[in-house]
């Protein structure tokens, strides 16, 4: 932060400082030797939020030499372009969608990822769809990683002996960041899904169902699987309560789309209706049981109740302070001054 404000890079560690180089390479080697045989390791990391410089570039060179089969990632080089080959991908934290578009319009030599984005603190993850939609239009944008998955909180008992999830300041420490680490899409403790999880799940689904009044366009974004491996269900809910349910056979090949006629007719009785087309697992998986919903789309419409004429009519009386309305079986007075019922 000091370097960003002052442009004085003497404060940056490790940067180009030779006294730090052996230590950084030792750290890289220790991590490499520990994890090199783990199949889950796809990318080597040179660290996090340490600006740029020669020392981190040498770490990257070490990984490339010892393991040319894997990629190397580092975000800080976006602040120091002298060693742009440090990372095999362009990596930035929390850029706007417009900033990503602008960058790739000038330089698309590398795939672009957000190593952190859509910070999930509090009532967040809004407008996340702008980033996931960008993957459909910008080939070099490869997505991002949400900070964070689980609230960084721990169990603590209140004065009544009841457990709760505690965070900064709950132990009397000052200064503190308070709830800054309560930034997950899953709650701490029992790992229940927060309301943010629903938004994330919807944006990450690999099947898009664009539902209209009488049809649904199914867009299969999966690379390898047909939609026929899932059960497709169609439900109609009236004022929030499901009143009809049926199935729909789909067979959309990977990376293609098909439009199907909805098997349920449009409702005629007054009310608000939600038509939902959803896809579910047919059988148990390691990560979810049969019936688990993997994707859905929805269309909402209203059937208005016919308007009834008032045979006796109504009388409106206006004054300086109030407006009165009188009918056959009612009287009501509105305040002009306060804008409400009197």
Describe each model-derived feature in a short phrase:
Residues 276, 281, 304-342:
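Beta-strand-rich N-terminal accessory domains
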Residues 215-220, 325, 329:
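Short, well-ordered beta-strand segments enriched in hydrophobic/aromatic residues
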Residues 94, 250-252, 335-341:
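A short, sequence-level motif marking secondary-structure junctions
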Residues 214-216, 232, 260-262, 275, ...:
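Hydrophobic residues positioned within well-ordered beta-strands of beta-sheet architectures
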Residues 230-232, 237-270, 279:
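Intrinsically disordered, low-complexity Pro/Gly/Ser/Thr-rich segments with frequent PxxP/GP/PP motifs
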Residues 1-215, 221-228, 233-242:
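Extended substrate-binding grooves/exosites of carbohydrate-active enzymes
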Residues 267-306:
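Terminal connector regions
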């Amino acid at each position: 932060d000091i370097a960003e404000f002052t442009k004085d890079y003497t404060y940056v560690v490790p940067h180009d400082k030779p006294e730090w180089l052996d230590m950084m390479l030792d750290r890289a080697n220790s991590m490499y030797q520990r994890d090199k045989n783990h199949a889950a390791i796809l990318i080597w990391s040179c660290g996090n939020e340490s600006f740029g410089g020669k020392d981190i570039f040498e770490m990257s060179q070490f990984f490339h030499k010892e393991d040319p089969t894997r990629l190397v990632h580092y975000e800080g080089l976006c602040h120091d372009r002298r060693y742009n080959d440090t990372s095999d991908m362009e990596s930035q934290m929390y850029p706007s969608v417009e900033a990503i578009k602008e960058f790739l319009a000038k330089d698309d030599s590398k795939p672009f990822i957000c190593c952190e984005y859509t910070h999930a603190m509090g009532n967040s993850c809004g407008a996340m769809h702008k980033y996931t939609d960008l993957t459909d239009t910008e080939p070099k944008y490869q997505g991002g990683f949400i900070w964070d998955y689980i609230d960084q909180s721990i169990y603590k008992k209140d004065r009544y002996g009841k457990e709760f999830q505690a965070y900064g300041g709950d132990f009397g420490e000052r200064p503190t960041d308070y709830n800054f680490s309560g930034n997950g899409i899953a709650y701490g403790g029992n790992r229940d899904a927060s309301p943010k999880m629903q938004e994330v799940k919807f944006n990450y689904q690999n099947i898009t169902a664009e539902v209209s009044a009488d049809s649904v366009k199914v867009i299969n974004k999966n690379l390898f699987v047909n939609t026929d491996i899932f059960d497709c269900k169609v439900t109609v809910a009236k004022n929030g309560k499901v009143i009809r349910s049926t199935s729909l056979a789909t067979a959309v090949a990977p990376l293609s789309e098909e439009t199907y006629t909805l098997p349920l007719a449009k409702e005629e009785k007054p009310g608000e209706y939600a038509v939902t087309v959803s896809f579910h697992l047919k059988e148990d998986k390691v990560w979810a049981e049969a019936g688990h919903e993997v994707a859905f789309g929805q269309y909402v419409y209203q059937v208005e109740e016919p308007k009834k004429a008032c045979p006796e009519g109504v009388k409106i009386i206006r004054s300086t302070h109030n407006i009165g309305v009188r009918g056959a079986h009612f009287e009501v007075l509105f305040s002009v001054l306060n804008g409400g019922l009197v």
